[in-house]
Amino acid sequence: DLSIPMVFMTYANVVFSYGAEKFISTCHDIGIDGLILPDLPYEEKDEFLPICEKYDVDLISLIAPTSDKRIGVISKDAKGFIYIVSSLGVTGTRSEITTDLGSVVSVIRQNTDVPCAVGFGISTPEQASKMASLSDGAIVGSAIIKIIEKYGKDSPKHVGEYIKSMKDAL
């Protein structure tokens, strides 16, 4: 029996507008395992954490390349997996990722055994391979959304081909 964890990524104001309890309980009811709120500062996670725990939905921690102390504090509390932000800024494709992510992963590994994966800007098989070699995986989002925008109803075939090329690189 195969189970693929599903994680929902949205902004905190969407959850607030809908109602945090209603939103997170609905996530649980439809089989969502985790919630990523990229605009939620770590210091404000307690707005959502008790509700996530109540409904067994992991509130996924994002860790940016900042100080070792901050990386350590955030990683000690992590649930589900850790989303390592490849570079500062917004999501989207990038031609290259130059951040020293090896040192970020090293600090995470010193503080937790929760898996970590790198995202923000991963769009090529080469980038996915490099990020997966540094961590437990690579997260691809914006590149898939662009394929869907381009092909609309015909996107499943193209998304499948793209994902296969990424998977083959790992």
Question: What does each of the following model-derived ranges do?
Answer:
Residues 31-44, 58-66, 72:
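Catalytic beta/alpha-barrel core
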Residues 66-76, 118, 122-138:
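Catalytic cores of alpha/beta
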Residues 6-10, 35-37, 59-63, 82-84, ...:
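Hydrophobic faces of well-ordered beta-strands that scaffold small-molecule active sites
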Residues 27, 74, 131, 141, ...:
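Conserved, mostly hydrophobic/aromatic
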Residues 72-110, 147-149:
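Glycine/Thr-rich beta-alpha phosphate-binding loop at enzyme active sites
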Residues 1-37:
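Active-site beta->alpha loop and helix N-cap motifs at the rims of alpha/beta catalytic domains
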